[in-house]
């Protein structure tokens, strides 16, 4: 018997209420929580406070583009995680933090994070790895990583989930 797969269409994170998952920062435009600097030959922006509330390791991950299928999602009870696209928008699955031992497919959304944005996921928020919107892609992430840290990967109840454009 063929396995049924839930299919989701990715939505721009700017068009939904992202607060159940964390915060979005637009580093390309002025906004709350950001600082700016400029000179004749550059303009720059940064978050006014640390982007995560713990010490963090900076990571760089390569992943496939859309479509992708996720059988599991991860959560971090000990740290927030910031994700930043490199050369193209990124897409990942996200579900609110709960006391449940696994993410439930009915709670999962596929979100697009545009270039120039940072998505900061709260502790306990379920998420997949990020993928390029168009093709194989790289993204940066920032989280508290150490040997034996309690990140957990769990199967998606009602999954797997395939994400399409």
Label each residue range with its predicted role.
Residues 125:
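Short beta-strand-plus-loop segments that form exposed binding edges in beta-rich domains
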